[in-house]
From Swiss-Prot:
Gene3D superfamilies: Survival protein SurE-like phosphatase/nucleotidase. GO terms for cellular component: cytoplasm. It catalyses: a ribonucleoside 5'-phosphate + H2O = a ribonucleoside + phosphate. It is found in: Cytoplasm. Keywords: Cytoplasm, Hydrolase, Metal-binding, Nucleotide-binding. The gene is surE. The lineage of its organism: Archaea, Methanobacteriati, Methanobacteriota, Methanomada group, Methanopyri. Its EC number is 3.1.3.5. This is 5'-nucleotidase SurE. A divalent metal cation binds at residues 8-9, 39, 94. InterPro entries: SurE (IPR030048), SurE-like_Pase/nucleotidase (IPR002828), SurE-like_sf (IPR036523). Its cofactor is a divalent metal cation. Binds 1 divalent metal cation per subunit. GO terms for molecular function: 5'-nucleotidase activity; metal ion binding; nucleotide binding.
Length: 261
């Protein structure tokens, strides 16, 4: 199995190193990842500027650090660096969970969807991090990836045997909280209640920090609900985001009447 690994936390992330350790025991690994933190960029790609690359080493594997996004990394890795597109893309292991429909903003999930959109199956895997500071700290020493590595290894073997062709969004609780359950569940509607903080710089110019408060009462049976209760949660994803066509048609009827005068 030929595996392309990327992430959105950047090439120096301990989660990326953990993913490399998991994957290289199962297949042939290629690593292409952003040079810097890219959380929140979703599936965006770099169209208006070149993507620079730097050759480095990650866990003994030759790797490329790129100036672009996780989706850029997938495109460059799959269609330029590798002789042929990979059998699978692994995005992660992300520092912090990626659950609910808010995954649309995740660079980790965005990379997996970019792979799927180009005919490559993918896994987006994220690790619950209880220390908020560790989510953006590439020197974090207190994140235990042992369970996530076990999950990823087992999934790779399962996918190889099952001929999986889609995207799996995988979220792993802190090992100390795992209740022994693995749940295949739908996405919650949202994970955060928006929290916008307005500030002023020393020159009186206004600026904002965008943040959010994690919802503590999500609907039962959703990924956020089950993760908060200590389960490993897995959600199959697709790039088809088509909504309710019948409901839209009711609205469009009024539009047709208005335009026909």
């Amino acid at each position: 199995m030929r595996i392309l690994i990327t992430n959105d936390d950047g090439i120096a992330s301990p989660g990326l190193r953990a993913a490399v350790r998991a994957c290289r025991s199962v297949g042939e690994v290629t690593v292409v990842a952003p040079a810097t933190q890219q959380s929140g960029v979703g599936r965006s790609i770099s169209l208006l500027e070149p993507v620079r690359v730097e050759e480095i080493e990650v866990e003994g594997v030759d790797a490329l650090a790129i100036s672009g996004t996780p989706a850029d990394a997938v495109l460059i890795g799959a269609f330029s660096i590798m002789d042929e597109p990979p059998d699978l893309v692994v995005s992660g292991i992300n520092l912090g969970e990626n659950v609910s429909a808010d995954v649309t903003t995740s660079g980790t999930v965005g990379a997996a969807l970019e792979a799927y959109g180009n005919g490559i199956p993918a896994i987006a895997i994220s690790q619950e991090v209880r220390d908020a500071r560790a989510r953006v700290d590439n020197n974090a020493k207190n994140v235990d990836f042992t369970l996530a590595i076990r999950v990823l290894k087992a999934l790779l073997e399962a996918i190889r045997g099952a001929n999986w062709e889609g995207v799996l969004n995988v979220n792993v609780p802190d090992p100390d909280r795992w209740n022994g359950e693995i749940k295949v569940v739908p996405l919650a509607f949202t994970m955060y209640r928006p929290r916008i903080e307005k500030r002023y710089d020393p020159r009186g110019r206004r600026y904002y920090w965008i943040d959010g408060e994690i919802i503590q009462d999500p609907p039962e049976g959703t990924d956020l609900y089950e993760l908060q209760r200590g389960s490993i949660v897995i959600t199959p994803l697709t790039t088809d985001v088509t909504g309710d066509l019948d409901a839209a048609e009711n609205v469009i009827k009024e539009l047709r009447r208005a335009l026909r005068g």
